[in-house]
C-alpha cells in the first residue's frame, strides 16, 4: 500500500519582518514545509494476474461460497482476522503495518431476480462475486533488522486457494498456508518462498487457524534465522560451483522416484533453471556484475526470480 503524503508546517517568527519585506502588524511569519518520502509498503507479492482489494471490500462486496451440504467455507476475511489476532497476541506491544491483500480468479454469479437477463443487461447489483484465490501480508514495523546492508521488517501473512477444495461435496478440511519471515515472496496460487517458517494447514474451523498461527510464531527464532541469512551473504560461490549446482538441478529431474524421495523436493523445471543461468550472467542485482564470484544470497535470489516466471 502507498503511504499518504503528509506536510508538516512549522511557523518561524521574525524571518520576513527582519528583512523589511512585510509589516509585522499583519503577519507572524514564515513556514517551513517538509515532505515525507513515499515508500512502497509491500514488495512481497508476485502481482501478475492479481489485483489489490481492501478488507472492507471483501466483507461488503463478496459472498462466501459454501460446500455441497450448504456449510460455509472459511471466508478470506476470517482467515486474515485470525492471523492478525494471533500476531497481535504473540507480538503484543509491537507496531503493525497495513495489511495488503491481493486476489485473483474472480467467480461471478447472479441473484435469482436476474436469471432471465442477458449478460449485457446485468447491473452490478444483479451479480454475486467472490475470489477463488487470495494472499495477504503485513509487516511488524518495530521488529526490523539490517540484513546484507538493507533494512528488513518481520513479515507475516497467508495464502489460500478455493480451487483446492471440493465445493460440490460435503464440508471437509480446508487448506491454507501461513508464513513468517524477513523476506517473503508470495502469489495467489500458493507459490511461496520464505526465509522463515511456513505452515500448510488443513482445518475445519477458524479457531484451528488461530492455534496453528500461534504455534508457528513460537517455533520461529527471528535472530537465529537472521544470522543464517547473513551467513548466506558472506558465503561465496565460484563459477565452477555454480555450474555444479545447475548440473545437479538438471540431474534431479531424471532421478528414479525412489531416489527423489530421499532428497529435498525441487520444484524448479528446465525453464526455471535456464532463467537462473541467464540471471547469473545479466541480472543487474544478483548476477556476476563483473565479479568472479556471487554469494549464496545472490544464488537464492536468482532462483526465486526464476521461480516467479512460472506463475
Pin down the residues of each PLM region.
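Compositionally biased, flexible interaction segments
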Residues: 56-173
Amino acid at each position: 500500500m502507498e503511504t499518504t503524503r503528509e506536510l508538516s508546517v512549522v511557523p518561524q517568527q521574525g524571518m520576513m519582518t527582519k528583512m523589511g519585506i512585510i509589516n509585522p502588524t499583519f503577519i507572524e511569519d514564515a513556514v517551513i514545509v517538509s515532505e515525507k518520502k513515499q515508500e512502497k509498503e509491500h514488495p512481497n507479492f508476485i502481482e501478475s494476474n492479481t489485483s489489490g482489494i481492501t478488507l472492507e471490500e471483501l466483507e461488503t462486496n463478496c459472498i462466501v461460497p459454501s460446500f455441497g451440504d450448504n456449510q460455509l467455507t472459511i471466508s478470506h476475511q476470517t482467515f486474515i482476522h485470525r492471523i492478525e489476532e494471533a500476531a497481535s497476541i504473540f507480538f503484543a506491544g509491537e507496531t503493525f503495518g497495513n495489511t495488503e491483500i491481493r486476489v485473483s480468479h474472480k467467480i461471478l454469479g447472479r441473484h435469482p431476480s436476474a436469471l432471465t437477463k442477458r449478460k449485457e443487461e446485468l447491473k452490478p447489483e444483479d451479480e454475486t462475486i467472490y475470489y477463488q484465490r487470495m494472499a495477504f501480508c503485513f509487516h511488524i514495523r518495530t521488529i526490523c533488522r539490517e540484513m546484507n546492508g538493507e533494512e528488513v521488517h518481520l513479515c507475516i501473512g497467508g495464502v489460500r486457494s478455493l480451487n483446492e477444495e471440493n465445493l460440490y461435496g460435503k464440508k471437509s478440511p480446508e487448506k491454507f498456508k501461513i508464513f513468517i519471515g524477513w523476506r517473503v515472496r508470495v502469489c495467489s496460487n500458493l507459490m511461496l518462498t520464505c526465509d522463515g517458517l511456513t505452515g500448510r494447514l488443513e482445518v475445519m474451523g477458524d479457531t484451528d487457524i488461530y492455534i496453528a498461527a500461534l504455534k508457528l510464531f513460537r517455533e520461529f527464532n527471528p535472530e537465529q534465522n537472521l544470522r543464517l541469512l547473513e551467513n548466506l551473504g558472506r558465503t561465496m560461490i565460484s563459477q565452477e560451483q555454480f555450474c555444479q549446482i545447475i548440473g545437479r538441478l538438471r540431474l534431479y529431474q531424471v532421478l528414479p522416484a525412489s531416489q527423489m524421495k530421499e532428497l529435498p523436493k525441487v520444484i524448479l523445471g528446465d525453464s526455471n533453471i535456464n532463467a537462473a543461468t541467464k540471471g547469473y550472467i545479466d541480472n543487474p542485482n544478483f548476477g556476476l556484475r563483473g565479479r568472479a564470484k556471487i554469494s549464496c544470497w545472490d544464488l537464492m535470489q536468482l532462483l526465486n526470480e526464476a521461480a516467479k516466471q512460472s506463475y
